[in-house]
Amino acid sequence: MKIKLLCTVLLAMSFANTFAQSSKSTWGKTDYEDAPWVKNVSRPNEITEGLQNRHLSVWSSHGRYYDAKKGGWRWQRPILFGTTEDLYTQTIVLPYLIPMLENAGAIVFTPRERDWQKNEIIVDNDSRTNYKEESMKKKWATTSDKGFAQHYGSYNDGENPFTAGTARQVKARKRNSKISSVVYQPTFLETGRYAVYVSYQTQKKSVEAAEYIVFHKGQETHFRVNQRMGGGTWVYLGTFEFDKGNSINNSVVLTNHSSHRGIVTTDAVRFGGGMGNIVRGGTVSGLPRFLEGARYSAQWAGAPWNVVSKSNGSNDYNDDINCRSLMTNWLAGGSCYLPEKKDGKKVPIELTLAIHSDAGVKTDDSYVGTLGICTTQDGNKTLGDGLSRKVSKTFAEQLVANVKKDLDNAFHINWTTRSVWDRNYSETRLPEVPSAILETLSHQNFPDIKLGQDPNFKFTFARSVYKTVLKYEANMHGKTYTVQPLAPNNFKIEYVSANKVRLQWRPTTDASEPTATPTSYNVYVAMGTRGFDNGMNVRNPYFDIELLPGIVYNFKVTACNRGGESFPTEVLSALRNEGATQTILIVNAFSRLSSPAVVNTSTEQGFDLEADPGLSYGPVAGWAGRQANFNKAMMGKEGPSALGYGGEELVGKVIAGNDFNYVKDHAEALRHAGKYNIVSSNSKAVEYGEVDLSKYAMVDLLLGNEKDDGHSLYYYKTFKPALRQQLTKYLNNRGKLFVSGSYLASDMQGVDEQDWLKNNLKITFDGANYDNYNSVVSGMGMSFDVYRTINEQHYGAYTPDYILPVDNAFSTLTYADGKTAAVAYKGTDNSVFTLSFPFECIKDAPTRNSIMKGIVNFLMKK
């Protein structure tokens, strides 16, 4: 008996040692080195030490789902402080994290709809509407397998659109002549940004470099798609600006030109995220698809029923959690990372990450903070290709530690972390590749969400996560990494000859990342009404370009290195007018990003969206509605009596934020104002003395909604001392200044600041205009509307200033209540026109042109 027991123990020890030796802590020699699923071949910068050829699955938590027990569509988490987790985490993942990963070269799959576009247009070979084939040397034919087909109206649960139609195929051709092609030319109901998804079939002889060309607002971007993987679902190419209507300049073309022999296949092409169309309980959600859970997107993407609904239709809540990982496994099956799963799509996804927020409160105004979650004790003993599950714990630990380090370094806040839980969670148990859940913060604790709704917090948080993914992947493959740079600063444009301008900027240092140094820059150009091109990579921090006359040129710049590309600068503009002898300078001083107005007293907490909804980085779909309950005594409760409870009137609205492209609105209006050249600059370049204002016949200072609000993580002041100094010097030299902004007087409450307004702008502060629902402004021979409220088209002039003229200045525009909205001054010393709302908030372009012409004539004519 003792001998038998000893043998059993020895056998167990031998098995344990064998298992320990066979399970890996890195991918080792396992590495995908063939053509990526999708490659943008128009990218001007080369990435060699980033996330190139890495395929990742990343998602934001929850989403609207159908509750079969209670009978109705509902959120998975409660509405608190104007949002819900179902909405909030998307505002980190979609505008920040995924773009950072893609800028590093990664191919990112996300199981929830990623496009904040409510319209959807599908062009398909089965309907033939807006679909056109051209067969040259090689002829298009129908494949033997089922493909996508769309029918009118909604879809029943379990109905797979990718088995309802057909697909097409053609032999590939190496020669770049007599090329066969398909044109997908949709009719867009609205101008806007649309995600482009293609679909095709993977066959035995499929090519690994199918050529797709996206035509967008007169530009074209080329892609290579590896059709040896990922057939029979939607494949994301990118998001592009398209014009309203039907035009070849806004289309997708697939050709059979390829460097490889084989077959090119094609099916439907989808433009835009669209509205939810899956019926549950007899009804659709009634919301955009991007607000729904992943379960419904998975069905629309052709996933098998056992992936879409593990519960077989009985529990959508569980299905939504499970299908994210199951869809990742389905796509990755058969790749080098999941070689044993033969029935998959062979997409080499090697990492999953779920971004959540959490509940919990602190009564002492401290942070609940960040938590990591992994699963090492449940599920399969090893991950794909024999990888130890413990690698997921390493990933989760690094995510949490780096978030604290980066947030503390950036904002000096002593951010709280809550270690890492190693527990049985579906999103970390089911994936067959390394995985983690990151609970960003507590959406129930106001100190957390107060920071969490600041766009600069979101950027820094997302950048920390991106950097952790980058470093983790480099370690897993034994590679060198380089962190992508930060966006350039002090961007300016100046004339260097009669028809040539120079764009110039400074690199931004990232003190926490020594590798994040730019080695080159991408310069993007848009002429007139055309969209931005694909960029030109330059080595130096400047770029000269000759301008054609009469066309407004728009520019933006990114910083690059071996690790990838930064976010862009703001858009600056320039115009050359034949025969012009004077130049007008537009100065962009509107860089504010902020949460809504903060209420934080001994008895009340929350966001006051009515006073100021804040400014997101571009549009955002993260708000549910205005907060109704501010009572701190109800902290930690749920339902209508809870602190933070509010409405749902903003659900489904993609609310406009700071797009950083308002200089072009001013430039376009100035183009109609007379025969002047136009250049522009960021205000920091002016503050640093890098721009000589005395060279310009007129300065147009764009302040937008800039102000020091007292709660933002960064300091946004309308007239900083350095800017005031430069403007005073300019005005003392008979300068001509046009300045517009919502808070240009209320943000100047110090005695010296008020004196500066009186002496230089000839105005005083006369209170705030709280009547945001009366948008009419009158004067200068017209009445017109101004954006004043939360909307989807343009940020609003929320509670703008009333101003009064002093000395010989006079009122020129009034709000609906008769109080002054604009003051003009013309003296022997200088001329000033002050507008107490942002010029770009005038809704109608012809009205902007007329108002600008009147202002320029007043300032420039003697």
Question: Where are these predicted regions, by residue range?
Answer:
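A glycine-rich, often tryptophan-bearing local segment used as a flexible ligand/cofactor-contacting loop or short
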Residues: 705-817, 846-853
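A short beta-strand element within beta-rich, extracytoplasmic domains
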Residues: 180-204
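Beta-strand-rich modules
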Residues: 544-565
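Pro/Thr/Ser/Gly-rich low-complexity, intrinsically disordered linker/stalk tracts
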Residues: 472-515, 549, 563-582
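Active-site microenvironments of hydrolase-like enzyme catalytic domains
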Residues: 291-389, 421-444
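Aromatic-Pro/Gly-enriched surface loop or interdomain linker
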Residues: 81, 98-104, 112, 281, ...
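Extracellular carbohydrate recognition and processing domains
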Residues: 217-246
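Active-site-adjacent mobile loop/cap segments within catalytic or ligand-binding domains
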Residues: 251, 257, 268-276, 351, ...
